[in-house]
Amino acid sequence: MIIVKLTANRICCSLLQLRRSYEHFYIFVFLPEIPLFRFSHLKLFPKNLQIQRLVSAMMERTYGRRKPGIPRTLSDSLNDSVSQTEYLSSSSSPDIEPIDYSLLPFSSQESSSLWHSSSRSNFREDYPQNGGVVRRAKRVRNGAEAAAFTSTLLEAQEFGELMEHEDEVNFALDGLRKGHQLRIRRASLSSLLSICASQHQRRSLRAQGISQSIIDAILVLSLDDIPSNLAAATLFFALTADGQDEHFMESPKCIKFLIKLLKPVIVTSTEGKPRNIGFKLLSLLKDVDAARDPVKMDDPSSSDILSRVQELLVNCKEMRLNDSYITETTRPELSTKWVALLAMERACVSKISFDDTSGSVKKTGGNFKEKLRELGGLDAVLEVVMDCHAVMERWVEYDALSVQEKKDNLHKQSLMLLLKCLKIMENATFLSTDNQNHLLGFKKCLGSHDSRMSFTELTISVIKMLSGLHLRGGFSSPNTNNVNSHYSNGGNHDSVLEANRKVTNEVVTISSDTYSTVGSISTRNGSVSQRSQSIIHLDFSPTSMSGSQSSVSGNEPTTSKTRVGSTISGSFAGRLASLGSDIARTTLRTTQAGEPICKKFGEFAPPEESEDPFAFDLEDYKPSKWAVVSVNQKKSRAQKKKGCYKQSKDESLYQLFSSQEESSNHRLNSQEESSNRDCSTSLQPSHCTNDIDEECLCLLFDCLLTAVKVLMNLTNDNVVGCRQVGGCRGLESMAELIARHFPSFTRSQLFSEMEKTGSSHQKKDKYLTDQELDFLVAILGLLVNLVERDGVNRSRLASASVPITKPEELQESEQEMIPLLCSIFLTNQGSAETKEETTTFTLDDEEAVLEGEKEAEKMIVEAYSALLLAFLSTESRSIRNSIKDYLPKRNLAILVPVLERFVAFHMTLNMIPPETHKAVMGVIESCKSP
């Protein structure tokens, strides 16, 4: 508290000087014959009319009639010619009638304040730079100025509040300058996070031109503190996510800043080192405190930043509040890498337009993804993908998660980072041939592979591992009886961490500013796919940890999607759906890449004395007895539910799944002998089942779907991409995905009759879920791209065989791909044309509308499967006859009506390229011939 005795004409100037020196202040002013009153934030208090007039006069002298946002120098107050006596006499003059402030249009409380004032606000150092703006000359006072004085008072009141908001930002920006202590930097970033929390506040900052100043200050920060990095990344994303700064986002300084955020933070740990008196004295002079210690990350300033980051991302609808996380420290989304990848993903989304005359698709808007490739951004994202790939390989190898990794949700963080990277690749390859070619030309050695691996091989390997994990139901808790229990117990943890460091890329310092770039974009021949997704963890990941998630939230990732059964196919993404009760889900033990830098962030750790000499002794860091009892009760209830869940498992289904997995393992092992780059994902199922983590299943499914769409974009009208995917056994991998994730097509009554009689007219009325439909259409679209212009791929797909398990035999057998594709076509061959003629319904009939939607979805699958069979039939006479054997009346003419509707639909929308139209018309004529 500061007690000041000043004259009236000096009070405002002194107040501004005091605000530059103190964070928290209350100013009490002693004036002759005037009672003590509080002067706070230039607001009026309507209790004493004499004081009101005095304060309003001072406000007019300070701010005058200048517009908001125009700075005013301190010399303006010193050079005023009107003295204190003149103001006092004018305020007490009998010529001026008393003003009834209750009748004013608004008061200081009624005026719209865009955000609450923060105690951590100050003026920027250069605020009075250039001498400020000279305000207009003061008019000569006279007795007839009462109305004008009232108008000035209202304007000054409004302008004062606007200046208050600007002062908050300026004060926070002042704390971001070099030379300030770390706690001041964190406090300033926390204040800016609260200021930018809502959309209307960010719009106000943009209108006043303040948002650019905030971004400029963030771009020059030294990224050596994890909480500060998270706050800076979140502010950058929030202020640039509206898409109005496309050209600014394309600047090298913005892209390099995002790339720096993807690099690991090098922090020298002080754990285990005694802190002597010299260290304590040094901490008083320099910014050396426990906040830089990666183990002591549960200090109040870090927790405050985490809570504000979560609030801002929730307001931006990038994540949801989730009660399952006890604190913000356990949220896997609150990561610097994740927020940086989120900003890249949003900036890579392309705006497209359709040319009415030519029917072509054109990209409009900025060239962020092209600049990202040129400056090395795509290469940096690829490094994160490789780190996530190494993490998943260790999950497969060790088959266990440590207790701490499970507690900190590090496996979810890796999947979220991977998802965000895949989304960037999908958006970057959309309508960008340069980015596609850059990814297709990528080759790099991974830690677990002796030879160089291409991006196509890397993506297919990721798909295989994700598929295996998804079919097993996610992850299991560590088991002491496991072969690798020594890892989860920490017995051999250091050696594992050392191996992890060797596998991953070397640590790159934050100051690095040289990178190379990659790009990519998503378009499909019969369909163009693009998807923008979003989700949200403080960057505790080591060099090998990284990953990502369109609009995904903490508990249930959500995705925006557009479904078009045509040349332009929107995002076929969705959340995970149950794949049927015939698959008993078992859990897979996994191991993470290594302990994160700040792994113990969420643990209770009381600060040491040397952390902050002015800090309070926070003895309540440890959980209370009541909290411990509550946690124990929750654990016991969870264990009871877990036991009931185990007892309710269907043993016969488990045996079926075990048989299928064992046979699948044998086949994949034979594939590994021929290719060292194929990664087997069909691991032996764990014999101890656990509660299924639905959030993990959603992440696994979204990653799997997005990876397939990345390959679909790389093969769209790209001969090199089609050859690469085909040469890396991509066709066989997609065939296995269909057989394993859609067993209904191989186990249905229709498929059994097809094997016996060669054809069947009976169809099983089974609708796919939204998630199954998205995944199946993406796979079929990729297969269409692969076989449309490549005869070698057509022969490979026609001769491919997939492992299937018949329920009655409980054993695995090989099945050719052509019967499976015919089963998909006939199962989804709806009677839409007959229903269209005989059935009429209104929009009020909800059931009829839903039925029509399901029929439309079946028509999409029917069209793509028919197009795929038609392309295969043009390769050779033997393949053509094989397809006929599984169609009714051994005639390909059944495909013609479906293909004609497909072409007519696209012609109506004028969305089919001439090359595609010519190719489809050619296969239609081929199907008409006997």
From Swiss-Prot:
Residues 541-553 have a biased composition (Low complexity). GO terms for biological process: cell division; DNA repair; embryo development ending in seed dormancy; meiotic chromosome segregation; meiotic sister chromatid cohesion; meiotic sister chromatid cohesion involved in meiosis I; meiotic sister chromatid segregation; mitotic sister chromatid cohesion. Keywords: Cell cycle, Cell division, Chromosome, Chromosome partition, Meiosis, Mitosis, Nucleus. GO terms for cellular component: chromosome; nucleus. Residues 540-566 are annotated as: Disordered. Disruption phenotype: Fewer leaves, more flowers and higher germination rates. InterPro entries: ARM-like, ARM-type_fold, WAPL, WAPL_C. Transmembrane segments: none annotated. SUPFAM superfamilies: ARM repeat (SSF48371). Residues 854-909 form the WAPL domain. Residues 554-566 have a biased composition (Polar residues). Expressed in roots, leaves, buds and siliques. It comes from the Eukaryota. It is found in: Nucleus; Chromosome. Regulator of sister chromatid cohesion in meiosis which negatively regulates cohesin association with chromatin, acting as an antagonist of CTF7. Cohesion ensures that chromosome partitioning is accurate in both meiotic and mitotic cells and plays an important role in DNA repair. Essential for the prophase removal of cohesin during meiosis thus determining the timely release of meiotic cohesion. Important for proper spindle attachment and assembly during meiosis. Helps to prevent abnormal centromere association during prophase I in meiocytes. Required for early embryonic patterning. Interacts with the cohesin complex throughout the cell cycle. PANTHER family: WINGS APART-LIKE PROTEIN HOMOLOG. Belongs to the WAPL family. This is Wings apart-like protein 1. It comes from Arabidopsis thaliana (Mouse-ear cress). The gene is WAPL1.
